Amino acid sequence: MEWHRITRPAARSGRAWDRSRGEPSEGEPSEDELRAPVSVLRRFTETPEQCWFCSWVGFGGTTERGAEVLLPGREYFLSYGAITDATTFENAPNLWWPKDRAWCVATEIDLLATYVGGSRDCIQALLDAEALEVFSVSVEDRVDADADTINSE
C-alpha cells in the first residue's frame, strides 16, 4: 500500500503533509522514528561505536559536511560515529551501516519507507519490535511510488 494512493483526496485539497499528525515524511525519518531501529540494530553488530553514515547533499542547509559519496543519481556526505549518532544528524542519514557490515539501513529520499538488510535474526528482531511498523520484503519487490496494486488509480 502506498501512502500517496490512500491519501490522495487530502493531497488534492491542498493540505500539506503534517508530521505532527503522524503523517510520514519522504526520505527523512525523525529522531524519534530512528530511536527504535537503533535500539534493535545495536544488538546485531560487534562495532556499534563504529558506523558510517551518508546524508543526501540535496537537503541543503546542512553543516554536516564530510567526504562525498557518489551513487547513481545521488550524492551524499559521508560521516563516521557511533550507532546512536543516527538520531543526532541535522538531516537524517539516508544510508548507514556498522564497520562490520552486519546490516545496512537505506532510506530513499523520494520514498516513505526505510529498508534494512541484515541477518535473519536481525530482521526478525525488527519485525518483532513493537515500536516499529515493519514488513518483510524481498529484493524482487517493487518499492517505487506506483508499486501499489491494491489502491491504484
Located regions from the model:
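Extended, low-hydrophobicity segments enriched in charged/polar residues
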Residues: 1-87
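N-terminal low-complexity, intrinsically disordered segments
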Residues: 2, 12-16, 88-105, 141-153
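Alpha-helical oligomerization segments
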Residues: 107-153
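Generic detector of leucine side chains in alpha-helical contexts
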Residues: 34, 41, 70-71, 78, ...
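Amphipathic protein-protein interaction modules
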Residues: 70-122
